């Protein structure tokens, strides 16, 4: 791991030690966030799978009923029955926060609270299979919106997981090792400088003692 290009001073050493503390703290927080994101994501994927199977089953039933209705009714009669719906739907889109990720919340309201208004026709000229298909589609709509909400949430969480994982890896495998190695390097340099200073001081001391000894000998000779 390459060290940073810094001056090997005590001030720089103190600064880098503080950066290392912050990096380790940030790494722990991001790792905890990543673990929770993964937990939320996997739970969402499991629920999404179960809901998708339910929606597909209901849509398959509605499709089969429509096929039977088409077989027993004329094309003109089927088109006329479905031409003028009694209900309209309003979709409300909001968001909720999951681990700092804004995910969609989809809710709908109908223009009428009368459940029979889902049928845009009279029952005299239509088949029971068409009624069943309309009823199934009416029931499956909330699940389809929930499924769309889950799939978009899963996509957004997956993106956040990838982004968080890159940040965790950058700290764990690049920044923290680089800071650690640079701190070791500066500490080693400072130790070398200190040993060098001690050696120089010892030499100066020896020289002063030698000069004092020589001066004393000259005085004795005089």
From Swiss-Prot:
The gene is atpD. One of its GO terms (molecular function) is proton-transporting ATPase activity, rotational mechanism. This is V-type ATP synthase subunit D. GO terms for biological process: proton motive force-driven plasma membrane ATP synthesis. Belongs to the V-ATPase D subunit family. Produces ATP from ADP in the presence of a proton gradient across the membrane. InterPro entries: V_ATPase_D. Keywords: ATP synthesis, Hydrogen ion transport, Ion transport, Transport. It comes from the Bacteria.
């Amino acid at each position: 791991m390459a060290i940073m290009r810094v001056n090997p001073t005590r001030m720089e050493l103190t600064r880098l030690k503080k950066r290392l503390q912050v990096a380790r703290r940030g790494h722990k927080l991001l790792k905890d966030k990543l673990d929770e994101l993964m937990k939320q994501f996997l739970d969402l994927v499991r629920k999404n799978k179960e809901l998708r199977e339910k929606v597909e089953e209901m849509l398959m039933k509605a499709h089969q009923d429509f096929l039977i209705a088409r077989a027993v009714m004329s094309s003109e009669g089927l088109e006329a029955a479905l031409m003028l719906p009694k209900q309209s739907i309003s979709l409300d889109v909001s968001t909720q926060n999951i681990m700092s990720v804004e995910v969609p919340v989809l809710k709908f309201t109908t223009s009428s609270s009368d459940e029979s208004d889902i049928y845009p026709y009279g029952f005299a000229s239509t088949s029971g299979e068409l009624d069943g298909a309309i009823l199934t589609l009416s029931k499956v709509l909330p699940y389809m919106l929930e499924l769309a909400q889950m799939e978009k949430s899963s996509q957004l969480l997956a993106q956040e997981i990838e982004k968080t994982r890159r940040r965790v890896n950058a700290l764990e495998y690049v920044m923290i090792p680089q800071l650690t190695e640079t701190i070791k390097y500066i500490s080693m340099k400072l130790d070398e400088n200190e040993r060098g200073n001690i050696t120089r001081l010892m030499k100066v001391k020896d020289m002063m003692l030698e000069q004092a000894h020589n001066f004393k000998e000259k005085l004795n000779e005089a």
